[in-house]
Amino acid sequence: MTALAHASARCVGFKATVAGGASRVTTTRGTGTRGATRTRGTPARAMFAGFEKMLKGDPAEKTQKRYQARVDAVNALAATTKALSDEELRAKTVEFRERLARGATVDDLLVEAFAVVREAADRVLGLRPFDVQLIGGMILHEGQIAEMRTGEGKTLVSALPAYLNALSGKGVHVVTVNDYLARRDAEWIGQIHKFLGLSCGLIQAGMTEEERRVGYGSDVTYVTNSELGFDYLRDNLAQSTGELVQRDFNFCIIDEVDSILIDEARTPLIISGMADKPSERYIQAAKIADAFEKDYHYKVDEKQKSVLLSEEGYEAAEDLLQVTDLYDPRTQWALYLINAIKAKELQKRDVNYIVRGQEIIIVDEFSGRTMQGRRWSDGLHQAVEAKEGVTIQNETVTIASVTYQAFFKSYPKLGGMTGTAETEITEFSNIYELEVAVVPTNRPVSREDSTDVVFRSETGKWNAVRKEISRMHKKGRPVLVGTTSVERSEQIAELLDEDGIPYELLNAKPENVERESEIVAQSGRKRAVTIATNMAGRGTDILLGGNAEFMARLRVRESLMQRIVQPEDGEIAFEKKGNLAKAGANKWAVKDGLYPCELSDATAKMLSDAVNTACSVWGERSLEALEAEERLSFACEKGPSDDEAILALRAVFNAIEVEYKEYTNAEKKEVLELGGLHVIGTERHESRRVDNQLRGRSGRQGDPGSTRYFLSLEDNLFRIFGGDRIQALMSAFRVEDMPIESGMLTNSLDEAQKKVERYFYDIRKQLFDYDQVLNSQREKVYFERRRALTATREDLQEQMLEYAELTIDDIVNANIDASEPATEWPLEGLVGKLRQYCYYFGEIDESDLRPVAEKGGINALRDFLVEKGQDAYNRKCQEVDAVESDLMMEAERFFILSQTDNLWKEHLQAIKFVQQAVGLRGYAQKDPLIEYKLEGFNLYTEMMAQIRRNVIYSVYMFQPQRPEQETELVGAGAEKENSRKK
């Protein structure tokens, strides 16, 4: 029997062994996990993986072969570009642009442009892109996704295609997940672009319209996904061209593309206005939900994340509320009660959200970060507020919205970078039409990923995790423990407190978030133990031996902030009383033992002098904390500056980093010899990709490292999605502290996770299919709106005549049945409708229409009325412009924009209701998506007709006053002045 067949037989035989009563387990000593690395069935899995690789080939090798010729061509230009002076290198940008103007394409320039950027990066940053980074840049330029492992230099890679595509003058957007990364990349990588003669822009929260306009007008713009999306929506609410900040889209590079296009795909960007909702109903519903019993009054579907009232629940709710119908649209009690039960059963404190004061703050399930300012929609957030007894905020109404799926597909070319994309190839291809290419690593990966250790119960799992941490801590290896929630991270912390093992806790709690950089800076040090909620999106590499750069920054921050930041009210009170000890003197101090060594006397004096210089230049205690943090960040980067304080702080930062590096480099050698960073996973995520992100924290740039996941059959993933096989194992095993070993089990766990991935992919795909309907409507509405916003007088007149003609068609079709004889047409009623529409039609009566209709039929009647409508419009233009020149143009533009905005807002509410309603039609054997498309199209057609009718009617009814008096138009326009707020 072959090894493969033998291994398979052992897997198949497992169930029979269990049935016979002898559970196949591995007894362990000391750690409770030692035997787990020899999980039965692993040889089969390894051989299957090997066969698959032989059949399909190594994707990284395929990528290398595909691009190697162009990489060699770039390398061949190295000597030539190195010989150029700075001025000659910069002149290459002018040369490239001239060649583009003469008909060359950016593809024609790729090899030369990449060689120029590589040389510029070497001169400006001291970093020379490796061959694999050139490959990554080529992949991005082709509009694909480059999968590059953690620590492979994705940030530098983006400079290559950004420069090349910016040569056209149409702009490039480099998108990051937060403001800090956008600013860091603009200041750091932006130096390359500026050195080569390109402009580099930055968009940050809180910027003015003019600052945003300048940023988006630059050749390369660094911006977060949310700022970019909200600016798009605000531009499509602008009341004048002077409010527009973005130009036409060209090329976009997304960093952490999986986070934005997949994890954020279900979260639309929404600009909303306030709408009153009675908070008493949320409170009443919360009380009823609290009194109701699960599985009697209602059922919970954790997989679908939904709840369903039982008959008993319906009757009890109607009795308690004294209503006859929970679904009465006038009261909508069903919605309040369903949300209250969801808040009780599905939204867990310290898992899905945290409570800070009187505020409910959502925790991002993927990154473990708090999502300040984000709120659940459709009343769910208010239901959670009622559950927790905090202030209930008003409901909102959507004014404009867009999903990231729809928004980023509007770019002519889109590329992305991430460390984990291969598992989502299908989604990137089917939804975004993006291919994924795996970039080879610069150095071979030497991390060891151990087989999962699986226990029957959570008790056994946590005991094993505890022992594993203790074992690694005694060895001296740094340990990173990944958890899926705040609650779980604190549970592990309690266990380590009992064992006397020091640790750092990094989760969404405010006190821990504030120390994030401090915690990450030392996570790679000897014997460090770090417990963190999902590390996805943390954006910082863990450096073995400690991060000297981060620690140097923290040392400068500790000394600078207490001298430069404005005191808070409480501190001022203490200072006035002369109690400086309580005036926040230690507010910025880090925990004892963070720094690897004391500063030398010379560097300590240098630090003191730099802080004094900053106080002298900026003013003692003169800056807000955020402004001070931004200045410190800039001082610790390499951006050009002539600010004396920035230069002094930068010099001492560099000096401290040099001293710290002596110690961190020595400690790194020790940690490397011990085996590097050990990562412990405590639960499989809904996506293998997020698990891989945690694993990827270890083994950076060829460093040694190891990972191991500790699981239990009671984990949510397997409890909800595991199926009959895992339930059978739960019944078969009774020993809690022994790991279960079985190839069948491992395969079942893998299948459960794949099932979850498929399930959530199907949800996102369904959302995408539905959103495609709304997105096509959005694009048409925004096109018409922008057409009016930017139109000349002649263009507006053409648009108005088009509206007038279509409106007359609507009136004729609504009042005349063309299939009947013209002699029987109710022309008197038609005349009455026309007079309501425009008072100029008062000059027309039935006797004018009857001969036209009887002689030429319906088409002649339409042509006659259209001609009269054009005459009426021209007379109205003359009447209005006689009061003030170009007043008619302003009025027309205002009416089109205001009617479009108001009716689009109503349309968003209506189509949202349709989407909720069509789901039930599946029970009638109808396709909900087709039903949604049909009803959505009807709603859209009626909305566009309503916009036209309202605009034309408003124009004809507009009666301008003389210039010395305020006109209704000006007053109405003033109300729109602040419409660009989120």
Protein language model regions, located:
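Conserved P-loop NTPase motor core
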Residues: 44-734, 783, 801
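N-terminal chloroplast transit peptides
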Residues: 1-32
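Intrinsically disordered, low-complexity segments enriched in Ser/Pro/Gly/Ala and basic residues
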Residues: 7-10, 22, 36, 364, ...
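N-terminal mitochondrial targeting presequences
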Residues: 3-5, 34, 38-49
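Extended, charged helical/alpha-beta scaffold domains that provide interaction surfaces
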Residues: 353-361, 367-374, 636-639, 672, ...
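Generic anion/oxyanion-binding catalytic loop in active/binding sites
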Residues: 27, 78, 454, 770, ...
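Intrinsically disordered, low-complexity segments used for protein-protein interactions
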Residues: 12-16, 27, 46, 613, ...
